[in-house]
């Protein structure tokens, strides 16, 4: 029975009535029960949509997020089996988000209006409201507004709105029919987080989107019903657009860690996509990446990202001169902010992975980026003051003149909006480059003099303490080697790195032994500590001696190099590090080769061991198989004896069963003929002769009864038929006369109508002939032209068809030849196979004939032995009879009757008969 029809207007009217009497919760519950009921499973989308819309309106008003979630999933469960249902699911999700956003906008507007009114009241009485209690309350409220809001009602609605967005995203996720709706809800959720500054919610949103993408990838490999196909370009483009938007919002909210993770997601999707992203989208990607690298302090990749961005921005037809000036100046400053080239390091450089985000094959160098910043397409659009600053620090850097030039230029640069963020790295560059130049020109300098040389107006001002910090940092980075004497406030520079490193090594003084003798009378704890210090000093001395020895060897090799002798301290350190890295790589290579040799020998040894184990296992298996074969042979021998005994018993039972089965079959055939019916239970007591006799008797009886009945029926039928004909003859004559009259009347009527119709038709045709006779000549001309045209066309078609016919004949001839060849090959193959089969059959027949002849020979021998045995027994009986005194002669033992031979038949034996014959022969043996 079909479920009752669902009427949405009744449910909505019932909900409105409950709301009107102040029971909105009951109205919501009634709609939820209707959505969860069994009737809703069979309803279509058009019927349920008004109900779910009303349900969502009430749920949003009452802030019942959990019930809304359950209702949405119930609706999706009912509708997800058809394309129309999925379209309705998307419409319901969009309606839900519209309701949420509208409600949130209204709440925010009411709150803003209330705050404005409170602000006006506070301005009227500025002092009256300031009390200790109010101050404490305000402080407490500020502590509670970490999320950005101090209104409980607004916060509750914000939480509800966020939960609604999250529910909707989970409701729409990973369904190919809902991709567009899902993408729209994702963008609206990001706008919500940005509008209300919800940083924590945005982090959760980003993590949720990653989980959805992972789940889509997992489901794509296992399921196939409406799953998201990431190989589809449109789908992948939508996911890429979501991640680009995610990066933009992350940067706007200054969530740099989340922005970097989003950048990695974008880069991964761009690699999967076969479509190249739009230049505007790619430019936005590089701009955000530059901001992220700047915040992380990676000025090298920051400048590389600006270079990528600027190269794309040059192709923008809508860009203005002011935009070019801003971005070119930004690129020049980012290139200047890069730290001086790093020294070579051993091991993996973590920045290589970051370079992959910029589609760079290798780590960029400062020199290349400075060259790119000095190209004509950048210089001609950059700010003039920025170019002057660039020339001072890069092109024509001079410590003595740089101070005066920068002092005059810095006030103009401070006014630039893009200069403020690069103050710290640019000041660091200027100070470090100045320190390096001073270290090249002088071996020592007074700290005050150096401070005066590097002091610049704001924002490049520098204190003595900061100067010492910069000196130490430069020394730690191996740009210079310094020693500061605070008594004289002098800074000394070392020119050779080996001298500085050897001086820094710890040396154990020779007086350590004498100190131990002087302190021999100290306490036990003091002596133990001294002994431990001596051991530690001895280890340090040994290690330092080894390091000093290696450095000495390395210095001898490098000092023979002319470039090393003429280079600066920084260049010498670079050469030393390159040489050390080269040597370390050689050592690692040798160790790797040795490890490979050891691994190879271990593998060979393991292989030999496995082969020996295989040989032993094979021998054990052969021995076990031999024992099992012996045991099996013994068991088979006993089983054969038991089988022979059982076979003899079974043979007798089978003889009886075969006889009974044959009789039942014969009885069934006899009963099927319908002549006589015999009970199958009597099969044991009947023979074929008895059954045939019963059938013959029954057939004779039936034939006799039939003859008697036929004779009686023929006599009865003859008299009855004669009486019928005598009675119907006058009636037939009367009917014939009446029929003749009716036929004559019908003929006259038909003839009259035919004459009238023919006259009318003749008149119409005569009028038509006279009308057409006027155009007969024109018709003949048109007919002749059409015939000529069709004749020409017919000739062309005939020629074309003849050509096609000839071509078809050739193809058919070739096909017939090929088919005959294949048939001949198949015939020869079949003949070969038939000959082989015939030979095999002849061989089998010869084998059977040999076995049959051998069996007959054995049977003849046995019969001969039995005959001789009977003769011997008869002779013995005769002897015994003649020697007895009793008048009654003894009856001789009758000879066993010969076995009844079956009638010879040309019909081949069945499988059961062959098995029976085999068992009988075995029993005789």
Swiss-Prot record:
List where in the cell it is found.
Cytoplasm
Residues in a coiled coil are 534-666, 785-885
List compositional bias (Basic residues) regions by residue number: 916-925
Keywords from UniProt, A to Z, are:
Coiled coil, Cytoplasm, Initiation factor, Protein biosynthesis, RNA-binding
Per the UniProt entry, what is one GO biological process? translation reinitiation
Q: Name one Pfam family in it.
A: PCI
The residue ranges flagged as biased composition, category Basic and acidic residues, are 112-121, 839-880
Mind telling me which GO cellular component terms the entry cites? Answer: eukaryotic 43S preinitiation complex; eukaryotic 48S preinitiation complex; eukaryotic translation initiation factor 3 complex, eIF3e; eukaryotic translation initiation factor 3 complex, eIF3m; multi-eIF complex
Q: Return the HAMAP family for the record.
A: eIF3a
What functional role does this protein have? RNA-binding component of the eukaryotic translation initiation factor 3 (eIF-3) complex, which is involved in protein synthesis of a specialized repertoire of mRNAs and, together with other initiation factors, stimulates binding of mRNA and methionyl-tRNAi to the 40S ribosome. The eIF-3 complex specifically targets and initiates translation of a subset of mRNAs involved in cell proliferation.
What's the protein here called?
Eukaryotic translation initiation factor 3 subunit A
Q: Which organism was this protein described from?
A: Kluyveromyces lactis (strain ATCC 8585 / CBS 2359 / DSM 70799 / NBRC 1267 / NRRL Y-1140 / WM37)
């Amino acid at each position: 029975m079909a479920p009752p029809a669902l009427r949405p207007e009744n449910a909505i009217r019932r909900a409105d009535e409950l709301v009107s009497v102040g029971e909105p919760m009951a109205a919501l519950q009634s709609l939820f029960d209707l959505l969860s009921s069994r009737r809703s499973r069979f309803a279509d989308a058009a019927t349920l949509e008004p109900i779910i819309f009303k349900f969502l309106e009430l749920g949003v008003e009452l802030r019942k997020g959990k019930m809304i979630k359950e209702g949405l999933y119930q609706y999706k469960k009912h509708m997800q089996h058809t394309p129309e249902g999925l379209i309705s699911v998307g419409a319901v999700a969009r309606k839900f988000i519209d309701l949420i956003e509208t409600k949130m906008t209204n709440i925010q507007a009411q709150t803003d209006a209330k705050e404005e009114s409170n602000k006006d009241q506070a301005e009227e009485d500025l002092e009256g409201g300031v009390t200790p209690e109010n101050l404490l309350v305000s402080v407490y409220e500020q502590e509670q507004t970490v999320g950005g809001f101090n209104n409980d009602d607004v916060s509750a609605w914000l939480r509800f709105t966020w939960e609604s967005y999250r529910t909707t995203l989970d409701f729409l996720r990973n369904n190919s029919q809902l991709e567009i709706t899902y993408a729209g809800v994702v963008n609206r959720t990001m706008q919500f987080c940005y509008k209300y500054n919800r940083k924590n919610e945005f982090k959760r949103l980003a993590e949720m989107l990653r989980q959805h993408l992972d789940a889509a990838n997992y489901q794509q490999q296992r399921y196939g019903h409406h799953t998201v196909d990431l190989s589809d370009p449109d789908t992948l483009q939508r996911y890429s657009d979501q991640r680009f938007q995610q990066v933009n919002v992350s940067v706007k909210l200054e969530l740099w860690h989340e922005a970097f993770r989003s950048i990695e997601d974008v880069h991964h999707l761009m690699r999967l996509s076969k479509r190249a992203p739009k230049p505007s989208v790619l430019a936005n990607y590089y701009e955000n990446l530059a901001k992220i690298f700047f915040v992380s302090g990676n000025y090298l990749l920051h400048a590389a990202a600006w270079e990528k961005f600027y190269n794309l921005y040059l192709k923008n037809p809508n860009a203005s001169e002011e935009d070019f000036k801003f971005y070119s100046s930004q690129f020049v400053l980012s290139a200047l902010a890069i730290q001086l080239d790093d020294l070579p390091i051993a091991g993996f450089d973590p920045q290589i992975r970051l370079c992959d985000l910029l589609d760079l094959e290798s780590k960029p160098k400062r020199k290349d980026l400075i060259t790119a910043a000095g190209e004509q397409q950048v210089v001609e659009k950059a700010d003039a003051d920025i170019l002057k600053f660039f020339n001072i620090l890069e092109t024509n850097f001079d410590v003595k003149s740089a101070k005066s030039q920068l002092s005059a230029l810095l006030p103009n640069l401070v006014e630039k909006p893009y200069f403020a963020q690069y103050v710290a790295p640019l000041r660091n560059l200027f100070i470090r480059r100045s320190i390096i130049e001073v270290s090249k020109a002088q071996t020592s300098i007074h700290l005050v003099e150096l401070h005066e040389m590097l002091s610049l107006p704001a924002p490049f001002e520098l204190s003595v303490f900061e100067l010492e910090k910069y000196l130490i940092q430069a020394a730690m980075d191996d740009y210079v080697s310094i020693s500061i004497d605070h008594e004289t406030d002098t800074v000394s520079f070392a020119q050779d790195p080996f001298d500085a490193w050897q001086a820094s090594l710890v040396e154990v003084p020779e007086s350590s032994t004498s100190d131990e003798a002087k302190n021999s009378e100290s306490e036990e704890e003091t002596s133990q500590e001294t002994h431990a210090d001596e051991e530690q000093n001895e280890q340090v001395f040994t290690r330092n001696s080894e390091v000093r020895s290696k450095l000495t060897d390395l210095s001898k090799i490098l000092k023979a190099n002319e470039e090393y002798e003429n280079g600066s301290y920084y260049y010498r350190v670079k050469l030393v590090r390159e040489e050390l890295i080269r040597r370390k790589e050689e050592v690692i290579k040798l160790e790797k080769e040795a490890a490979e040799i050891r691994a190879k020998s271990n593998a060979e040894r393991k292989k030999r061991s496995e082969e020996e184990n295989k040989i032993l296992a094979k021998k054990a298996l052969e021995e076990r198989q031999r024992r099992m074969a012996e045991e099996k042979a013994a068991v088979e021998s006993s089983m054969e004896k038991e089988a022979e005994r059982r076979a003899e018993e079974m043979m007798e039972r089978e003889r009886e069963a075969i006889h009974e089965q044959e009789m039942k079959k014969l009885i069934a055939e006899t009963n099927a003929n319908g002549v006589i019916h015999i009970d199958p239970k009597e099969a044991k007591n009947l023979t074929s002769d008895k059954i045939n006799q019963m059938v013959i008797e029954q057939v004779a009886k039936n034939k006799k009864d039939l003859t008697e009945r036929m004779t009686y029926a023929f006599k009865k039928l003859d008299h009855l038929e004669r009486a019928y004909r005598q009675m119907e003859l006058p009636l037939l004559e009367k009917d014939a006369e009446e029929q003749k009259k009716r036929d004559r009347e019908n003929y006259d009527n038909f003839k009259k109508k035919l004459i009238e119709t023919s006259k009318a038709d003749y008149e119409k045709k005569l009028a038509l002939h006279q009308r057409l006779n006027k155009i007969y000549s024109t018709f003949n001309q048109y007919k002749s032209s059409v015939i000529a045209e069709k004749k020409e066309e017919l000739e062309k078609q005939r020629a074309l068809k003849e050509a096609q016919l000839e071509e078809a004949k050739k193809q058919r001839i070739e096909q017939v030849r090929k088919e005959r060849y294949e048939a001949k090959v198949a015939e020869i193959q079949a003949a070969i196979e038939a000959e082989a089969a015939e030979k095999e059959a002849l061989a089998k027949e010869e084998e059977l004939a040999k076995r049959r002849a051998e069996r007959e020979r054995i049977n003849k021998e046995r019969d001969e032995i039995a005959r001789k045995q009977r003769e011997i027994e008869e002779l013995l009986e005769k002897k015994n009879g003649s020697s007895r005194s009793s008048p009654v002669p003894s009856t001789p033992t009758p000879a066993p009757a010969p076995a009844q031979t079956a009638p010879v038949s040309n019909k081949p034996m069945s499988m059961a008969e062959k098995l029976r014959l085999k068992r009988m022969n075995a029993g005789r043996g």
